Amino acid sequence: MNELESLKKKIIYRSAYRGTKEMDLLLTSFVSSIINTLSHIELRKLDIFLNCNDEDISNFYLNKIPITTFDDAKILNLLSCHKIK
């Protein structure tokens, strides 16, 4: 397994096992919709994003409250536009 595949597997796993079912559903859906469209650098940023706590991610997604610990505009824009199917 190469580094890119390993990183993708890590991201998929971390998006699916967050701590709350709501975050599991949101982030699993979000990650699966974008993971194959991101560059290696963007995947690293997504991995960093997944270090943010669930409350910050939820507040950003639902209320558009900025996440002070993460500032990548592309990832945040993709999340804000994401709709769970």
Predicted feature residues:
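Positively charged, polar, low-complexity stretches
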Residues: 2-43, 47-85
